[in-house]
Amino acid sequence: MKNNRRNFIKNLGVMGTTGLLMPNLVLGNTQENKNIMTNTTRPKVLFFDVNETLLDLTQMKKQVGKALNGREDLLSLWFTTMLQYSLVTTASGQYEHFGNIGAAALQMVAANNGISISEDEARKVILNSLRGLPAHPEVKEALAQLKKEGYKLVSFTNSSNEGVKKQFESAGLTDYFDERLSVEDVGKFKPFTDTYAWAARKMGVKSEECMLIAAHGWDVAGAVWAGWRAAFISRPGQQLFPLAPKTEIVESDLQKVADVLVTYK
């Protein structure tokens, strides 16, 4: 026992501050991360997040900001509140449409900042702001390239089935996808592990044969922890979660992600 204790203390000394703050560098996960980065086998299915990843949210942010009396500085708080309560809803064994949670979050943020928004007003703001969102400029060309290369493309969103259907019709994205998946059908929001497992089963593939492409660090983290591969699009204001495993592909837009994926065999 004393020898074990002495060895433990000795190892702590060897690790030093670097080992305590960045254990991956000391405990041998470097090779694992290297393997992730050099995996160039083709995923069987590419799953795409929708809002921010494929669709440009500039218009939505302006409308929500207007509802908050021009307080665009509150937009990030509104979105994180919406995400927080989607997690609360799932963790409590409940389900509400993401749009309804977004409207409730809008009311909460407004109330905390002395702004009055009724339930009906909040729902109209969220519903109207999500309609007619355009695709990011590079999205259609990138999707066409991936489809031409034989990839199976599936959208995978926290939004409702009807909501994403209308969004795709408006943005002209419908024909690029083989399938549309919504968490509405499983009743659990991303990034819960069960939700990614459900999507893999739905498409008849193993978790390790899936790749999520998303512009949200929380979504990418959830996918990787669920055993998926992932590509992160670093849209402005978006960051990877530093405590999550390494992400296989990190690029600034979907075209650059596609350029990497077409080299996979």
Annotate the PLM regions.
Residues 144, 160-161, 165-265:
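Asp-based, Mg2+/Mn2+-dependent phosphohydrolase catalytic module
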Residues 40-41, 149-151, 203-206:
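Glycine-rich phosphate-binding loop signature in dinucleotide/nucleotide-binding domains
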Residues 35-83:
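Active-site neighborhood of HAD-like aspartate-dependent phosphohydrolases
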Residues 61, 75, 79, 99, ...:
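An amphipathic alpha-helix signature
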